[in-house]
């Protein structure tokens, strides 16, 4: 593991000193390091300290993940065995269970900005699992979406969208006597 430390500074001025190998899990940081664009610290203007600390916790746990990037010059790490993968999956589930939905939305934005693919997938899957069995009204409430259709307009749109299901299939009808 690299002993080089990188200082990451959040949008609210909070600084985090992390191992370079952990910082490289943030693809935006990895590219800055590869392009020799780093002097003393890396400012991350779109991420608050609270969210960055959660992202870094995830990255520290996933520092040994296999990266399927053929252009990577780093030696490939061996694929984790089934038990290690199950342990990591269990850790991910526990990690997400303790985070409220508002923070998950902020993590999605941060993971996208920082290009942390594993965290982006995990957070998006968590939201997808959460809304899976919800009604449209419950989903609107969760995402603060205002329904601008009246009940009648909504029914008509559904009828139009599914009109094919109500059309008579003339090819298979019995001919009239």
From Swiss-Prot:
The protein's matches in SMART domains, at most eight in alphabetical order, are given as: Skp1
Paired cysteines (S-S)? none
Keyword field contains Nucleus? yes
Q: Name one GO biological process term.
A: ubiquitin-dependent protein catabolic process
Task: Note down the stretches annotated as region Interaction with the F-box domain of F-box proteins.
Answer: 108-167
Family the UniProt entry places it in: Belongs to the SKP1 family.
Q: What is this protein called?
A: SKP1-like protein 15
């Amino acid at each position: 593991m690299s002993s080089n430390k990188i200082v990451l500074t959040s949008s609210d001025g909070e600084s985090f000193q992390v191992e370079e190998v952990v910082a490289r899990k943030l693809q935006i940081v990895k590219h800055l390091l590869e392009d020799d664009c780093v002097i003393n610290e890396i400012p991350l203007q779109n991420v608050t300290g609270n969210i960055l600390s959660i992202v870094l916790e995830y990255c520290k746990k996933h520092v040994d993940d296999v990266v399927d990037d053929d252009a990577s010059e780093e030696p490939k790490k061996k694929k984790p065995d089934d038990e290690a993968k199950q342990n990591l999956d269990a850790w991910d589930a526990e990690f997400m269970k303790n985070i409220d939905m508002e923070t998950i939305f902020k993590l999605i934005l941060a993971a996208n900005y920082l290009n942390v693919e594993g965290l982006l997938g995990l957070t998006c899957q968590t939201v997808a699992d959460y809304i899976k069995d919800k009604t449209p009204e419950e989903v609107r409430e969760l995402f603060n979406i205002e329904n601008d259709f009246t009940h009648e307009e909504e029914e008509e749109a559904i009828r139009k969208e599914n009109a094919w299901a109500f059309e008579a299939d003339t090819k298979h009808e019995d001919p009239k006597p």
